[in-house]
Amino acid sequence: MRRPVIAGNWKMHMTCAQAREFMAAFLPLVADMPNDRDLVLAPPFTALSSMADLCKDSPIALSSQNVHWEGSGAFTGEISPSMLKEHGVTYTIVGHSEPRKYFSESDEQINHRARSSQANGLIPIVCVGETDEQRERGEAERVIRRQIEQGLEGLDADLLVVAYEPIWAIGTGKTCEAAEANRICGLIRSWVGSPDLVIQYGGSVKGGNIDELMGMSDIDGVLVGGASLQPDGFARIANYNVA
C-alpha cells in the first residue's frame, strides 16, 4: 500500500523568524490532518535547527533541499547527510530542476546524492521532468526515462520517492492536466518496475487542484513550491479530500 507524501519546498525563502511565524499559524490547521499521509517541509538549511524544534510532537517531517554525497571534506557550500540527520532531517530533495538548470547538475551527480542519502538512512525525493521545448518536440518520455534510469541506478525503490515535475509547470501557473500527470507517473512506475514506488506530482499545485490530483490512481502525493509558503494554502493541500 503506497502512503501519500505531501511535501513543501520553501526554496530560498523564510528566515528563522519567518519560519516560526509560519508554523504558529500552520500547526493548528493540520492538527486534525488525516493520519493516512505523511507531511514534509523542506526549509532552507539556515532554518533547519529552528524547524526541528518547532516540528517536535507534530505530524511534520523535515527534508533538506539538497545533500552532498561525501560525509565530509573540502566541499564549500555543501552539506553532508550526517549534518542533516543532526537536525532531525529524514528526507532529502535531489535533482530539482533549479540546480539542474542553474548549477548544471548531471544525472550522475543526482544519483550520487540519492545513493548517499539512502546509505545514511535518509529518504531521497528524486525529481525528474521535461522542459517545454522537450515536450513540444515529443521528447518528454525519452528525457524522463533517461533521468530515471541514470538517477535511480543502484537505489532501493522501497526507500525513495520520485517527484514528476514538468519544468514548464514549475512556478508558471501552468498545471499539467491531472490525467496526463497520472499517465507519466504510471510510466515511471512501470520503468522502475516497483508497484509500491511512491510518486509525487509537482508543478503549480494549489488548493484548487489538489483533490483532483490526489484522486488519480498513480499520483501518491505532491511536491509543492510557492503554495507551501502560505499557511492557509498549504494546510488546504495537506488536508486534501478525495471523494
Curated annotation (Swiss-Prot):
Gene3D superfamilies tied to this protein: Aldolase class I
Record keywords, A-Z: Cytoplasm, Gluconeogenesis, Glycolysis, Isomerase
Keyword Isomerase annotated: yes
Enzyme category, top tier: isomerase
The protein's name: Triosephosphate isomerase
GO cellular component: cytosol
Primary location recorded for the protein, binned into one broad class: cytoplasm
Subunit structure: Homodimer.
Binding site for substrate: N9, W10, K11, G171, S204, G225, G226
A molecular function (GO) term: triose-phosphate isomerase activity
Function of the molecule: Involved in the gluconeogenesis. Catalyzes stereospecifically the conversion of dihydroxyacetone phosphate (DHAP) to D-glyceraldehyde-3-phosphate (G3P).
